[in-house]
């Protein structure tokens, strides 16, 4: 199901994001996400520390858990043969496969589950699994669209 159109996107040293204008009138926005039988509310988030257990769901690898190994990581991609370093990312040992990027990453505290970011990349491969997964973290730039946005003022790239 198509829910909208991408009106702007950014891939820079601090951002890897897209802004979607909802155009499907049959799509209902919600601040609740159901992942692996866990309910994540978009109005809750949590700062994690090294050693914290995280959970992620990838399109290819499915449900995985792991441990945060760094809260101040960075990863360098090559875009148009130029290096681009993304900073302020979490590094975990949750295995990631190609196609997992964009998958939800969350943690648990008590009986509550909190969104902490999305899977973004990986560093080392071993038997088709990566040892380090980079998590684009919601902590410093958390923005939620609870209601459809009027994006008519945004410049199109």
Where are the model-predicted features located?
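Helical hairpin unit composed of two closely spaced alpha helices linked by a short loop
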Residues: 66-96, 101-102
């Amino acid at each position: 199901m198509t829910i909208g159109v991408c009106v702007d996107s950014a891939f820079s040293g601090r951002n890897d994001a897209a802004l979607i204008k909802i155009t499907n009138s049959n799509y209902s926005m919600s601040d609740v996400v159901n992942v692996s039988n866990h309910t994540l509310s978009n109005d809750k988030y949590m700062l994690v520390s090294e050693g914290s257990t995280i959970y992620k769901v990838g399109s290819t690898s499915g449900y995985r858990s792991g441990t945060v190994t760094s809260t101040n990581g960075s990863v360098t991609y090559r875009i148009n043969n130029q290096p681009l370093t993304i900073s302020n990312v979490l590094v975990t040992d949750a295995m990631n496969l190609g196609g997992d990027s964009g998958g939800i990453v969350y943690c648990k505290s008590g009986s509550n589950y909190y969104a902490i970011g999305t899977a973004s990349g990986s560093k080392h491969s071993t038997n088709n699994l990566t040892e380090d997964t980079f998590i684009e973290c919601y902590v410093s730039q958390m923005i939620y669209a609870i209601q459809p946005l009027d994006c008519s003022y945004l410049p199109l790239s």
